[in-house]
UniProtKB/Swiss-Prot annotation:
Biased composition regions of type Basic and acidic residues, renumbered to the chain: 155-165
GO-annotated biological processes: neural crest cell migration
Family: Belongs to the prickle / espinas / testin family.
Name the record gives this protein: Testin
Pfam families named in the record: LIM (PF00412), PET (PF06297)
Transmembrane segments: none
Sequence ranges assigned to domain PET in this UniProt record: 92-199
Key word Transcription regulation present: no
Origin species: Xenopus laevis
GO terms, molecular function: zinc ion binding
LIM zinc-binding domain location: 234-299, 300-359, 360-422
Length: 422
């Protein structure tokens, strides 16, 4: 029975989102079909985040799992039906009257996520301070951006061994220890407050811990004219620009009360993207998203996108791979000891390269083998052979000679060109 249940779980995982359209390829993709171990669509090779696969419920369960057994349990609730922790995502609905010809209608704007603060005006101002195309208004480009970042920054397979492919018992144990460690030591959620409120909070924290008063990040010169004009003496830890009076700031408890960020500056040190839902990982004085924090701690397989907990793995093309996952991107044959070609940063075996990616020779019209020398000019290609790279008129070999290219044809002289034109 247990084996049967495990099998069902795997099957359902691959059925989830099946047939969902690709937002990138549009009608070129037949619909989402999850590759057995890669985190991509088998039809178009795009990632899950490029398809309309994950629902808000699935995202909420993933984030809920992340916050389980942390100091952020107030942000989750466990469903009575299955006991799975679910993220209590704060949704903000703003209404405003719109004057019409006869009567007044109500305009409603729903944010799929907003900072969990009691002061809605503060949350609204926070949204105004991040780029418009990243504001998670329901049905907008910003809402889609948030979904993509949830998938990219917080992959489920970075926290849940059951989402990984064929881990050994020892690898599962190592992963569980790794996840427990980052939950206890580096995981955090940003908080939106006015700097003066943070200062008051810092004062209380400073006195309660060691009797000394923590100081907020302030401008170095007390008579700074710019600061005086803007009415604030607080500056952003990232950009060093001044905070405007009355604007909210983001702070990270792991970083300490002496550091504040503009809402648009609360970004990952590596990818420079807004930290989705202000979820951060603090390491060596820098903010990271979940993905790039994990990348700084463990090698990541370029094939399955999972962290590598095995002592044995391979390195190729500057990337790390599980031994069983260094495979052809097209046919999945293992490439160890085989000839392969890199196509758009993906390793492809020689047969697949010749079949799917090789350019054709303008002379013989056959595919050009990747190990064979070629001549390329302006998007046209020839075998570097005396029977292929020849004058289109007199068949003179042009290897090492001057030539005149005309729409895929090459000529040895003006005379030959004129003969072909007449």
């Amino acid at each position: 029975m247990e084996l049967e249940n495990k099998f069902k779980k795997v099957t359902l995982g691959h059925e989830e989102g099946s047939g969902a359209p690709c937002l990138k390829c549009k009608e070129k993709c037949e619909g989402f079909e999850l590759h057995f171990w890669r985190k991509i669509c088998r039809n178009c090779k795009c990632g899950q985040e490029e398809h309309s696969v994950l629902s808000n419920n699935e995202d909420d369960r993933k984030v809920g799992k992340l916050f389980e057994d942390t100091k952020y349990t107030a942000l989750i609730a466990k469903l009575k039906t299955d006991g799975i922790p679910t993220y209590k995502r704060n949704v903000m609905i703003l209404t405003s009257p719109v004057a019409a010809k006869k009567d007044v209608s109500i305009n409603t704007v729903t944010y799929e996520w907003a900072p969990p603060v009691q002061n809605q005006a503060l949350a609204r101002r926070y949204m105004e301070l991040i780029p418009k195309d990243k504001q998670p208004v329901a049905g907008s480009e910003g809402a889609q951006y948030r979904k993509k970042q949830l998938a990219k920054q917080l992959p489920a397979h970075d926290q849940d061994p059951s989402k990984c492919h064929e881990l050994s018992p020892n690898e599962v144990k190592q992963m569980e220890q790794f996840v427990k460690k980052y939950k206890n030591e580096v995981l955090g959620v940003g908080d939106v407050k006015l700097p003066k409120e943070v200062e008051a909070q810092a004062s209380g924290a400073g006195r309660s811990t060691n009797g000394s008063l923590s100081t907020l990040t302030t401008v170095k010169s007390t008579d700074d004219k710019v600061a005086a004009q803007k009415g604030s003496t607080y500056y952003c830890f990232r950009c060093k620009e001044n905070m405007r009076e009355g604007d909210p700031a983001v702070y990270a408890e792991r970083a300490g009360y002496d550091k504040l960020w503009h809402p648009s500056c609360f970004v990952c040190f590596t990818c420079n993207e807004l930290l989705v839902d202000m979820i951060y990982f603090w390491k060596n004085g820098k903010l990271y998203c979940g993905r790039h924090y994990c990348d700084s701690e463990k090698p990541r397989c370029a094939g399955c996108d999972e962290l590598i907990f095995s002592n044995e793995y391979t390195q190729a093309e500057g990337l790390n791979w599980h031994l069983k996952h260094f495979c052809c991107f097209d046919c999945d044959i293992v490439l160890a000891g085989e000839i392969y070609v890199m196509v758009n940063d993906k390793a492809v075996c020689k047969p697949c390269y010749v079949k799917n990616h090789a350019v054709s020779c303008q002379g013989c019209h056959n595919a050009i083998d990747p190990e064979v020398q070629r001549v390329s000019y302006n998007g046209f290609h020839w075998h570097a052979a005396p029977e292929c790279f020849i004058c289109s008129c007199c068949s003179k070999c042009l290897i090492g000679q001057k030539f005149m290219p005309i729409e895929g044809m090459v000529f040895c002289s003006v005379e030959c060109k004129k003969k072909m034109s007449s």
